Amino acid sequence: MKKYVLPLLLLGGCLCLSGCKAQRSYEPAPSVAAPSVTALEQPFRQMSGNPDGMALYSACTFSYGGQDWAVESYVPAELMLDGELMLDDSCHFLLRVVSGSQDAAVLLDEQVQLGAPAADVWVDGQEQLHVTLRDVRTACYQVTDYVYRPERHAMVGSTVLDASGINYVGTTQR
């Protein structure tokens, strides 16, 4: 043991004198766009039943302004098996808000590559209805907050977060 003490002390002294520093991890600059100031207006239109060839995947029903409402998510009917989505690399999603009068405003209607969009419903302190759309894909993370405007009978949205060119890793959500 004594024969190793001197070499270890010399090695430690050399490292101190040479300016050995702790390594730092690389943190790339975020590629997040500034929130949008442009309003996205989605008017309510008369719609009844499921869209052609689509099946209801999930829904959030709630009451607002004395009426029953729902946020509905649809996928191609052939991808549903016993109420479960057989998700492939690419899937067509349709998300819409249905008001008490059966009018609907479509928030998303597109093919999604490696992802599954979702929506959250909430009411703020001024009693305004919000539907927050989370469109998460492998290389994209976009959050759009839609607010119901009764005077226009429309959902008016603004982009809260728009990150593209990212590498989405995962979530704790089930």
Question: Where are these predicted regions, by residue range?
Answer:
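Small-residue packing motifs within transmembrane alpha-helices
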Residues: 8-10
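Positively charged n-region of N-terminal signal peptides that target proteins for export
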Residues: 1-4
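Exposed acidic/polar residues on beta-strands and adjacent loops within beta-sheet cores, strongest
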Residues: 21-174
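C-terminal motif of bacterial Sec signal peptides marking the signal peptidase cleavage site
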Residues: 16-19
